[in-house]
From Swiss-Prot:
Sample GO molecular function, one term: 2-C-methyl-D-erythritol 4-phosphate cytidylyltransferase activity
Catalytic activity annotation: 2-C-methyl-D-erythritol 4-phosphate + CTP + H(+) = 4-CDP-2-C-methyl-D-erythritol + diphosphate
Keyword NAD recorded: no
Keywords: Isoprene biosynthesis, Nucleotidyltransferase, Transferase
EC numbers, comma separated: 2.7.7.60
Organism: Prochlorococcus marinus subsp. pastoris (strain CCMP1986 / NIES-2087 / MED4)
Family: Belongs to the IspD/TarI cytidylyltransferase family. IspD subfamily.
PROSITE patterns from the UniProt entry: ISPD
UniProt site positions, description: Transition state stabilizer: 13, 20
Site for Positions MEP for the nucleophilic attack, residues: 150, 206
Record protein name field: 2-C-methyl-D-erythritol 4-phosphate cytidylyltransferase
Top-level enzyme category: transferase
Gene name for this UniProt entry: ispD
Amino acid sequence: MHVLIPAAGSGSRMKAGRNKLLIELEGESLIFWTIKSVLSASLVSWVGIIGQPYDKQELLKSVKNFSNKIKWINGGDTRQKSVFNGLNSLPSTAEKVLIHDGARCLVGPDLINKCAMELEQNDAVILATKVTDTIKIVDNRGYIKETPNRQNLWAAQTPQGFLVKRLRKAHEMAIEKNWTVTDDASLFEMLNWQVKIIEGNSSNIKITSPLDLKIAKLFLKDF
């Protein structure tokens, strides 16, 4: 299985003043823990880190223990463009790919393998967790318009897995139609292509704030 890891987090909400994936968690960078988790999955054979050229030296230094197992890919000015660059940098033999957020350093190898195996029967899969809070849809003035049934609501995570040809086609159509999305599964939705949900777990958080970092430290003790 081939894995692409977008790693261009600005760190603005972390108030880090640099790429948030370079922030330390228990003595190692966030990207270190992410790469370690991904490479622990038995079905993973190739990993590409997609980042900005100005971060390349520091990011690669922080994962030097895995330098012979990863490939660097220059990213674009958005996540969407970066993933497209990643797709175009995959080996020609790659048929399936997992896209995983660099800031989700607590994903377990079992979940990565599960996503990979589900791609045997599906063109697209994503990890997600059931929403437990009541969600409100509001208008632009802040007034509630609707309360959707939470039984049908899932919070998307990564990895998100795809057949390479299908995902590349989706990105090409997005460029043609000037679509902008926040995750790759959304492109499939816009094209009315099916995406299968795989239930994830609550520890697979995306670290975007100082509070997330504190929570991650607690999870890491049992990781």
